């Protein structure tokens, strides 16, 4: 069984907040993680096994949903247990009740570790909870598997993770072909069942075409007008569809650098299908050889690196990219939460080659934003200095450094 790296902050937040929400796409492992946390809390009770076991409800199951017909009474009956509500966006009325229950228990002296909410769609969960549970709820995002969660003894694991993506069932499939079939079925189920359950009335075929077009244009600057013309819809419709895919945590819009630099900057976001395995499934790429021969290979690699890094970045990190009208560019700018001494700006260039070289435009861009650190991540597995004060770091090393920063912040 894989140990998810966010389990430490999840248990920490349950010690501090009455309610914690795990957000992540379907099949990312939220339910498994919730049960692992519940088991750990039970074992770490006043004495081993003394804490009451958690109570789990899957709100997509009619029988479990029916138990919340009178949520106030239900929560009162189980006041001594951690209540886990899976797919909580299926019961939107419960948020207002949770607020009253939490406040009542606070007055009685209970302050933390009461509710664990799991949601596959930030659209509903964030909108419903931002006001009702303000100050009472902490959020944790669970991404599919990332490199720091793989067995350290398996040298081939990162390559398989890039090809298959991080959804547990896809990554752990018995073969590349079986993994591809799983991902293709995942896409179909999302389009034909899951999205309609959330309410939006969007033709499945239209959304599939858009998703596939985004995969073809992985890591490119968004051209909404071209997408709209290709699909025969308006620019506003493209924006609405993109909002949906982003809110479902399936697509990322990486915003451009927003501060003044004295240069004319590209102002549209770059767009990424967040899971590399879904990129490859949308394009029918089932093997490493097929991927390496496809034009998307560079964009796929860039998106995969970015998702792995952001999964480890400390809370409060702001991510963007930098590009001027004349081509000076940084693939990823991380504004890390720093001390009172000022900004911590990491400029990260992403290269697939194991012998990376840098353009003059990268150094110009780093000067433009006054980057405090200049980094290159490539397929090479060694750390070494490069000209111009640039450090080359393997992906795993940089992820571990970011992760250590997050753990230090949690311990503060």
Model regions and ranges:
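Conserved lysine of the Walker
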Residues: 30
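Accessory nucleic acid-recognition modules appended to NTPase machines
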Residues: 176, 180-344
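Interdomain motor-coupling "hinge/lid" segment immediately C-terminal to the ATP-binding subdomain
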Residues: 112-113, 120-122, 126-225, 249-250
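Conserved catalytic/switch belt of AAA+ P-loop NTPases
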Residues: 95-117, 131
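Pre-Walker A adenine-sensing motif
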Residues: 1-14
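Hydrophobic anchor at the beta1->P-loop junction of P-loop NTPases
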Residues: 22
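P-loop (Walker A) phosphate-binding loop of NTP-binding proteins
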Residues: 25
